[in-house]
């Protein structure tokens, strides 16, 4: 069985880990970093960028850069780029593809399976959208698990003594708090609460708005309509937020932020931690109610907790840590890396599903975060499954008709805690027809809710009189049809193929460029020891290859150009081999050592060679790079 990777698909940053040698390992991305910005961009040439390359160019390409797409999962939101509309699932799939590719490069094998985490307070539509994103990215999502639960799994792997902990998870876009009991090889979620619209992005926005207001007051210029200036302000706000976690004030300097008739304008500000705390006070306060609700639902007081774990980058904010301490009376534990522990927990679950002994025998018991109901007469939301019910679970209830001779019933499935169906999230509607005419209240219709281990809901209705049954077909606009998903899968595969093709083209060009340099270097070192006629042939081939390399754009090479470069490289390799073989033979006959030309008897062009064989290696990789 292949490896099952664990992915923390975050609002602002994502992370991937895997079980290796019985231990969870965080996988560094192609840029050498352990987390990847959840940012996707399309360059002016149409190239797709994901992660750090996408984030770096956001200032100059704000209109085609997409961030925090996770906040739109499970909705009918679409982003339009170059005339094409993308769903949140498709954009998320691009991030997942990047993480998948990084994992494959690390493991040296194909990866097709994953465990992906979601905020505990994600509803059914958001969970299904996450699963669809995985499918589009070419991943079989073996399990969807809640982020706080994953963090507890990472913590509980080495801490199995009995304890009750709180996981306080404040990420880039969402907030979750879970009360979890650990002991006897079981990790059981007792209760969960949260806010899907609260996270680090909101802290950044508060600072950005303050900066906008300050500049407008001082200079009379509204920067909110200037996309490039606004992007610079947002990046500066995020940087300032991070710096204020370790210092009491920071300087924000953005030269040439805009220009007026009077000339260029510069943005300068000193932001103190006290001012930052004032700007974000209401956001920190919003975490209090979910904490109280989770404790209440778990039937515990804060004093009964053994520990409070901090998860998510936003928990580094000192005011957040102070709030946690005031709410719980506990000094929050910093045992876990808040950026990586969720991915680590997901990889442990992946290892468990793959049969990895290092994942241990921990049993994971999670809960559904929101109550599930159907709409009954008067628009009432009649609950079948209460929130914080351990999953997987199944519950059935008998309902009947509301009018005489009613032959069909429309069933509206809702998720949430409000008393009326209209105030909750509708998961979908379906109709059970063919009910024999009868007096009101006579037909018996059994409605069954089935929540799987991923927290995804399946609903069916059965007429017990006729045996006729109907399963739910989600009609909410946020869900992609099977046809849409299949189409997106194909497009994602095409993008992957395009990316590989582009990389192969750049590799071919770089190898050719390296060969031109190394051959010229070796010829210069050998000087007049080379046979004149053979040297002329090599110079002709070298110049031909150099012209092809110089005349190609590494970002936009055609197949014909790549083939030409490869053919010219082979031709140069052949003539150079002949030239340096002759030189080697003449030096051997004369008993001389010849010029210093690397490990073998030829120029220093990769893997050395002996006995007149070519000193070239096909796997030479040029160290030059271009930063985008």
Curated annotation (Swiss-Prot):
The keyword Isomerase does not apply. The keyword Repeat does not apply. It comes from the Bacteria. Residues 591-605 have a biased composition (Gly residues). CDD domains: ASKHA_NBD_HSP70_DnaK-like. The modification Phosphothreonine is found at residue 174. It holds the Pfam family HSP70. GO terms for molecular function: ATP binding; ATP-dependent protein folding chaperone; unfolded protein binding. InterPro entries: ATPase_NBD (IPR043129), Chaperone_DnaK (IPR012725), Heat_shock_70_CS (IPR018181), HSP70_C_sf (IPR029048), HSP70_peptide-bd_sf (IPR029047), Hsp_70_fam (IPR013126). HAMAP family: DnaK. This is Chaperone protein DnaK. It comes from Lachnospira eligens (strain ATCC 27750 / DSM 3376 / VPI C15-48 / C15-B4). The gene is dnaK.
């Amino acid at each position: 069985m292949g490896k099952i990777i664990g992915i923390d698909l975050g609002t602002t940053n994502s992370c991937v880990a895997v079980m290796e040698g019985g231990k969870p390992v965080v996988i560094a991305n192609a840029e050498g970093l352990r987390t990847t910005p959840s940012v996707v961009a399309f360059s002016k040439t149409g190239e797709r960028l994901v992660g750090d390359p996408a984030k770096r160019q956001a200032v100059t390409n704000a209109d085609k850069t997409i961030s925090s797409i996770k906040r739109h999962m499970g909705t009918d939101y679409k982003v339009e780029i170059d005339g094409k509309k993308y769903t949140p699932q498709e954009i998320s799939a691009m991030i997942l593809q990047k993480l998948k590719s990084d994992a494959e490069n690390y493991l040296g094998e194909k990866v097709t399976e994953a465990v992906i985490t979601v905020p505990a307070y994600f509803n059914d539509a958001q969970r299904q959208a996450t699963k669809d994103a995985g499918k589009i990215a070419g991943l079989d999502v073996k399990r969807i698990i809640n982020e706080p639960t994953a963090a507890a799994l990472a913590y509980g792997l080495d801490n199995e003594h009995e304890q009750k902990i709180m996981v306080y998870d404040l990420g880039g876009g969402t907030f979750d708090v879970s009360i979890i009991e650990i002991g006897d090889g079981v990790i059981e979620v007792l209760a969960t609460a949260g806010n899907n619209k609260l996270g680090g992005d909101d802290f950044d926005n508060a600072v950005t708005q303050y900066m906008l207001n300050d500049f407008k007051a001082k200079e009379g210029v509204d920067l909110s309509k200037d996309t490039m200036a606004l992007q610079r302000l947002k990046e500066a706000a995020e940087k300032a937020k991070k710096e204020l976690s370790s210092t009491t004030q920071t300087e924000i300097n953005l030269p040439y932020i805009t220009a007026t008739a009077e000339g260029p304008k510069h943005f300068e500000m000193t932001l103190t931690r006290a001012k930052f705390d004032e700007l974000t006070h209401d956001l920190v306060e919003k975490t209090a109610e979910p904490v109280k609700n989770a404790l209440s639902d778990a039937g515990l007081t804060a004093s009964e907790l053994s520990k409070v774990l901090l998860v998510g980058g936003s928990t580094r904010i000192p005011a957040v840590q102070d709030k946690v301490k005031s709410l719980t009376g506990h000094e929050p534990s910093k045992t876990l890396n808040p950026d990586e522990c969720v991915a680590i927990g997901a990889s442990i679950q992946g290892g468990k599903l793959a049969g990895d002994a290092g994942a241990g025998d921990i049993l994971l018991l999670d809960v559904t975060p929101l109550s599930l109901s159907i709409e009954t007469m008067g628009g009432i939301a009649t609950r079948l499954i209460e929130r914080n019910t351990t999953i997987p679970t199944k519950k059935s209830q008998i309902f009947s008709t509301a009018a005489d001779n009613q032959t069909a019933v429309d069933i509206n499935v809702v998720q949430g805690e409000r008393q009326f169906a209209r105030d909750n999230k509708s998961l979908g509607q379906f109709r059970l027809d063919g009910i024999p005419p009868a007096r009101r209240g006579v037909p018996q219709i059994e409605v069954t809710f089935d929540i799987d281990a991923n927290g995804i809901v399946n609903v069916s209705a059965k007429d017990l009189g006729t045996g006729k049954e109907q399963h739910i077909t989600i009609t909410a606009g946020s869900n992609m049809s099977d046809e849409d998903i299949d189409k997106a899968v194909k497009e994602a595969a095409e993008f992957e193929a395009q990316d590989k093709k582009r990389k192969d083209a750049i590799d071919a060009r770089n190898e050719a460029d390296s060969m031109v340099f190394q051959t010229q270097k070796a010829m210069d070192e050998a000087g007049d020891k080379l046979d004149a006629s053979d040297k002329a042939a090599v110079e002709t081939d070298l110049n031909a290859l150099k012209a092809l390399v110089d005349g190609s754009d590494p970002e936009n090479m055609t197949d014909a150009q790549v083939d030409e470069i490869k053919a010219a490289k082979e031709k140069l390799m052949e003539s150079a081999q002949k030239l340096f073989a002759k030189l080697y033979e003449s030096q051997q006959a004369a008993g001389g050592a010849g010029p210093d030309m690397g490990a073998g008897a030829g120029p220093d062009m990769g893997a050395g060679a002996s006995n007149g064989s070519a000193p070239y290696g096909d796997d030479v990789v040029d160290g030059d790079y271009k930063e985008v």
